[in-house]
Structure formats: structure tokens, C-alpha cells
A protein has these predicted regions:
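Glycine-rich phosphate/nucleotide-binding loop
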Residues: 3, 64, 75, 125, ...
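Flexible, glycine/charged-enriched surface loops at secondary-structure junctions
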Residues: 54-57, 184-193, 216-224, 312-321, ...
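Glycine-rich phosphate/diphosphate-binding loop of Rossmann-like nucleotide-binding domains
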Residues: 21-22, 27-50, 155-226
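N-terminal beta-loop-helix "entrance" segment that forms/cooperates
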Residues: 52-75, 231-233
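N-terminal glycine-rich phosphate/adenylate-binding segment common to multiple enzyme folds
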Residues: 66-161, 248-250
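N-terminal phosphate-binding or glycine-rich loops at protein starts, especially the Walker A/P-loop
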Residues: 3-7, 12, 17-59, 407, ...
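C-terminal non-catalytic interaction/assembly regions of soluble proteins
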Residues: 361-500
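Buried hydrophobic positions in well-ordered alpha/beta secondary-structure cores of metabolic enzymes
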Residues: 32-35, 85, 139, 177, ...
């Protein structure tokens, strides 16, 4: 299983032979927990293989958080990342408690690393797995979805997290997945969504996938609802080739895929954007294992292989990857790896790295050796098509209230007299219609969505919405949020209430 073809040529060094490679500037973050141990081991292997690396060590993670930077990265570090355009990162620890933002999400979004490529393969019979022959690439959207990180507490009882999905973001990741499949000779791209429930956001992802698929007639496609898709991935991964999906779903199923293939500790990840890339293992920092020399460096080492291929050092990548495969074949394993063959030896982090170094120049005897020299690069990071502006009309507003004064009928009795020239069309609680004609059995919290519509489908001006809010405030009602209800070329851009 090869991991990744060389990506944007503008970022690549030229490799003709080991002596002529220009050293590749790379920012290296040693990480937290097991991070420093597995990074030292990985760098030792890469450098022993002859990789031309100009390492610029940077501080990220827990120590930076503790120094008062809530993002986990100091301002001056951004300049190093902009200069190198390449980050090799060990796992980091985000301190528990409020006030800290995920550094991984910050890095991916700030640097525009929109594509998260996570290849997963089985190494049977040397690593125990129920699925020998598994070879799946998960392409995860990296910048949007619930990972936008926009959350609010709105009432005593209700918290909110916004799911943001854009047409350009979706188009870029879907096209990236198809280009990856085409240039690596893969036969099928599968799309995972939950558009039977989230018909607008996940519906956009599915529709975009279907539209772009027509441009790649030689590639088979299918679509799965995420729940059954994840179940099928776990039970029969060989039916999948490339999977493209949203941020949250991709995060979850890539761990599932890695675990059923053998171990999460074996799985690498490449985060790709137009202006740079970040390479890391998919697992976390595992603080309880820190300093014990037991962590598996394989995921981070294979991420380093992906980094070398990406940056134009495929021969060095081949040397490392094939030596790693030979090490696995020879039964040199870390403690997390399920053993399939008798006689395998359990070793620590440092000994595993030494074993790989000892096998540099060797190829696996049974597993297929990797060849990166002929891999075709992606010509460019895909660009989204220009946005076609629709005719947008505001036809109503959803006003969300913090209210605990009684029943839905009681609330409607307060709202209707102050509705003015708009009509109270519906009240929902946690998305379920409770007025008109609600059911007494429906459990309600203190968070209410009150839908007001202009009569006869007329347009509703912003001044009309502002006037409505003034009337609600005058009636002593606590509104915590509004959402304008708009049509786009006559098509409603809002969902119905459950039961409406």
C-alpha cells in the first residue's frame, strides 16, 4: 500500500540522486506526552535513510498553552510555518477545562489545509487483523462542519454547536478525492453523509459529490448514510477504496479503519492545502505512556514517508517504507500491535527505530514493496467554481427564545398579539413542532424556536424583523438568537420543523 503521491509541485524539492537533494526546510513540533519519543525515533530513521531535512524546531501544544497562548501556538511561530510551508508534528495535549482551543483545528483552518488524507491498510499475516487485503484511503474535509468550533450557551438548559458546510469547501474536497483516485489508479470513490436527517448541509455534500462524479466516468461511485457506511467499513472494508466525507465523520471512521486494520498506532495522516502541508499520526499524545519507551512510532514515521513523497524525495520515502515493512515482517513489533505470527518480539520505541534503521536498503519478502518513484503528482490543489449568485428573498425569521413560563399554547398566546404584520407560523422545541397541534407527550426545554412568516410569501425587510424584535422585547420575552428565512431562486433555504 502506497501512502500518497507527490502533491503540489510548487512545494517540492527536486530529487535526482541522494547527493543533489536540496535540504527541505521543515518545521518540527516535538509534541507532548509520547510525542518527543516517537518524533526522535522517526527523525532518526528518516535521517539515517538519507532524507535531506533542514529542521526548524518549533514549540506547539501544552507548554505554549500554559504560557498563556489559548490557541497553543505563539504568534512568532506562524512566521516559521509560513516560511517552511511544511510541518511535521507529533501529537500534542490540549489542557482540560474551558478557554483552550484545539491546536489541530487551528492549524488546519488557519493554514488552509482543507484535505486530510488518511490511508489505512492491513499487514497480514504479520499484524493480526480480521481483514487481510484491506486498503482504504479516507479523504476528510478539514475546515468546516461542526469543527468550525462555533458554540454558545443560549439558555439555562440548552447549548448550541453550529454545523457550517460551504459549497466551495465541499467542492474542493470532493474534487480532491476524485483526483487522488484517478492519479493512483483507484477504482471507486464512496461518499458518506447523513443527508436523510441534515438535508441542507449534508444534502449539499451529497449533491456536490453526485455532480462532480459525472466528470470522472471511469471511477465507480456510491453513497452511504454514515451509520450503515461505518458499520460496513468495520465489517467489510474491502468493498471500499476511497471514501470522501465531512470533518466529524472522517475523524471517526478513520480511527475505526485504523483499528480494524491492526492498530491506530500504525496510521499516518497528511493535511494538504494550497500553501503548505502538515504530516502527523492520527493518534493522540497518550500522557500515561510518556517516558516509558513503549509508544509505537509507526504512525508518525509513515507520516514522515508521506512528507518525503510530497516534497519530492520519493527514493528516500521508499527506503524508509520498505525497511519498515521488513521490520514488521521480521516480527519486530511494539506492544500495541496485535501479533499474528509466533515468535514476534515486543520492543520499545527506541529499539523499534533501530530495527528499521538496520533494515534500510532491504525490501519486504512477502508484503508488496512500495514504489513511489513513478507516482503521479496532483497538478494543483482543486479550485472551486465561481459562485453563481442566486436571487435571495427574506420571507420570515426564526426567533429563538429563552422562556420557561408554561406550555407551548401559553407561549403562542404571548407571541400572537405582538406579531404585528407577520404571522406566527410555528413553534418548535429542540426541532420538534409543539405548536400548533403539538402533542402533550413531547418533552420541552426552555429553548423555543418561533417561526414568523410574512403573509402570502411576501418579502420581509430587515426593518420589519427589527421592529418584531422590539415588540418581543417590550413584551418581556428574552430572544437569544435569530435566523433569517430566505429563498434562493425561489427555493427555501431553511428546513421544516419535525412533524410540520
Amino acid at each position: 500500500m502506497t501512502l500518497l503521491p507527490p502533491l503540489p509541485p510548487s512545494l517540492r524539492a527536486r530529487e535526482s540522486d541522494a547527493q543533489s537533494i536540496r535540504p527541505m526546510p521543515v518545521a518540527v513540533a516535538m509534541g507532548d506526552g509520547i510525542g518527543p519519543e516517537i518524533m526522535r525515533a522517526s527523525l532518526a530513521v528518516l535521517q539515517a535513510a538519507g532524507a535531506a531535512l533542514e529542521i526548524r524546531e518549533i514549540a506547539l501544544g501544552e507548554a505554549v498553552y500554559r504560557a498563556g497562548h489559548s490557541s497553543g501556538i505563539a504568534p512568532e511561530t506562524w512566521e516559521v510555518l509560513r516560511a517552511t510551508r511544511l510541518l511535521y508534528k507529533a501529537p500534542i495535549t490540549t489542557p482540560q477545562g474551558g478557554g483552550y482551543k484545539s491546536l489541530n483545528v487551528t492549524l488546519r483552518k488557519t493554514l488552509g489545509l482543507f484535505a486530510n488524507v488518511r490511508p489505512t491498510g492491513a499487514y497480514a499475516p504479520f499484524v493480526a487483523t480480521r481483514h487481510p487485503g484491506m486498503d482504504v484511503v479516507i479523504v476528510r474535509e478539514n475546515e468546516e462542519d461542526l469543527y468550525a468550533g462555533i458554540e454558545h450557551r443560549q439558555t439555562d438548559e440548552v447549548y448550541q454547536c453550529l454545523k457550517l458546510v460551504s459549497r466551495p469547501g465541499t467542492e474542493k474536497i470532493v474534487r480532491f478525492a476524485f483526483e487522488h483516485a484517478r492519479r493512483n489508479g483507484r477504482r471507486k470513490v464512496s461518499c458518506f453523509t447523513k443527508d436523510n436527517i441534515m438535508k441542507l448541509t449534508d444534502g449539499l455534500f451529497h449533491k456536490t459529490f453526485d455532480a462532480i462524479a459525472k466528470e470522472y466516468p471511469e471511477i465507480a461511485t456510491d453513497h452511504w448514510i454514515i451509520d450503515i457506511g461505518a458499520a460496513r467499513l468495520a465489517s467489510n472494508p474491502k468493498q471500499f477504496d476511497v471514501i470522501v466525507t465531512g470533518n466529524l465523520y472522517g475523524d471517526i471512521i478513520s480511527d475505526i479503519a485504523a483499528e480494524i486494520a491492526g492498530s491506530v498506532g500504525l496510521a499516518p495522516s497528511a493535511n494538504i492545502g494550497a500553501h503548505g502541508a502538515m504530516f502527523e499520526a492520527i493518534h493522540g499524545s497518550a500522557p500515561p505512556l510518556a517516558g516509558r519507551d513503549v509508544a509505537n512510532p509507526s504512525g508518525l514515521l509513515l507520516a514522515g514517508v508521506m512528507m518525503l513523497v510530497h516534497a519530492g524525495q520519493p527514493r528516500m520515502a521508499e527506503r524508509v517504507h520498505n525497511a519498515w515493512l521488513r521490520t514488521i515482517e521480521d516480527g519486530v513489533h511494539t506492544a500495541d500491535m496485535p501479533q499474528a505470527a509466533p515468535g514476534a518480539t515486543r520492543v520499545g520505541t527506541r529499539a523499534f527505530a533501530r530495527a528499521v534503521i538496520d533494515r534500510l536498503g532491504l525490501a519486504p519478502r512477502q508484503l508488496p514493496p512500495v514504489r513511489y518513484g513513478e507516482a503521479a503528482p496532483l497538478v494543483a490543489v482543486p479550485e472551486a467554481a465561481p459562485t453563481v449568485r442566486a436571487e435571495k428573498r427574506t420571507v420570515g425569521v426564526d426567533v429563538f427564545l429563552h422562556w420557561s413560563g408554561g406550555t407551548p399554547d401559553n407561549l403562542a398566546a404571548l407571541l400572537r398579539p405582538v406579531a404585528g404584520d407577520v404571522e406566527l407560523a410555528m413553534i418548535t422545541n429542540r426541532g420538534v413542532k409543539v405548536w400548533p397541534q403539538g402533542l402533550a407527550e413531547t418533552f420541552c426545554t426552555d429553548h423555543w424556536r418561533c417561526r414568523f412568516l410574512a403573509p402570502g410569501g411576501q418579502a420581509l425587510a430587515h426593518t420589519g424583523i427589527a421592529a418584531l424584535l422590539l415588540r418581543l422585547a417590550g413584551a418581556g420575552l428574552d430572544f437569544v438568537k435569530t435566523e433569517h428565512l430566505c429563498t434562493f431562486d425561489g427555493v427555501p433555504g431553511f428546513s421544516l420543523g419535525q412533524g410540520q
